Swiss-Prot record:
Belongs to the MsrA Met sulfoxide reductase family. The active site is at 10. Keywords: Oxidoreductase. Disulfide bonds: none annotated. This is Peptide methionine sulfoxide reductase MsrA. It comes from Clostridium perfringens (strain SM101 / Type A). The keyword Oxidoreductase applies. It catalyses: L-methionyl-[protein] + [thioredoxin]-disulfide + H2O = L-methionyl-(S)-S-oxide-[protein] + [thioredoxin]-dithiol; [thioredoxin]-disulfide + L-methionine + H2O = L-methionine (S)-S-oxide + [thioredoxin]-dithiol.
């Protein structure tokens, strides 16, 4: 089992999209790479905590490779948009790939480099080691499964 943490704007839609991928064993939404301890949703929306809304993905690399998972992730974000995805604006909505295993870095950078060839604008999706992670409040977990008509900036159908 491998882990990767992905930020692609509002984490509700990102989690729903990723949870539907064959080989993804589990997902959980949370806050990553910020400046404080134990942030709340209100903190990340109203204070300068610099956390990103993220989805922690556990996947079976015998079913889906990191390269394949990232290829799917790139399709749901605008990697050239800084701190904005859809109607959501703020540093918490930045795009990012946060790796747990340093051995994943080369594959991530290769994926980003390959994608850059199809964009004239610079890709601003950050690639960093996972520095910290806090699970989001329970009402955010599997939000769109619990609230099928809830807000989502990603086209899921």
């Amino acid at each position: 089992m491998k882990k990767i943490v992905l930020a692609g704007g509002c984490f509700w839609g990102v989690e729903e999209f990723l949870s539907r991928i064959n080989g993804v064993v589990s997902t959980e939404v949370g806050y990553a790479n910020g400046r404080t301890e134990n942030p709340t949703y209100e903190d990340i929306c109203t204070k300068n905590t610099y956390f990103a809304e993220v989805c922690l993905v556990n996947y079976d690399e015998n079913i889906i490779s990191l390269k394949e998972l990232l290829a799917k992730f790139w399709t749901i974000i605008d990697p050239t948009s800084l701190n904005k995805q859809g109607n959501d604006v703020g540093s918490q909505y930045r795009t990012g790939i946060y790796y747990v295993e340093p051995s994943d870095l080369e594959e991530i950078l290769n994926s980003k480099e390959e994608l850059q060839k199809s964009y004239s604008k610079k890709i601003v999706t950050e690639v960093k080691p996972l520095e910290n992670y806090y699970k989001a409040e329970e009402y955010h977990q599997k939000y769109l499964k619990k609230n099928p008509n809830g807000y989502c900036h990603i086209k899921l159908d």
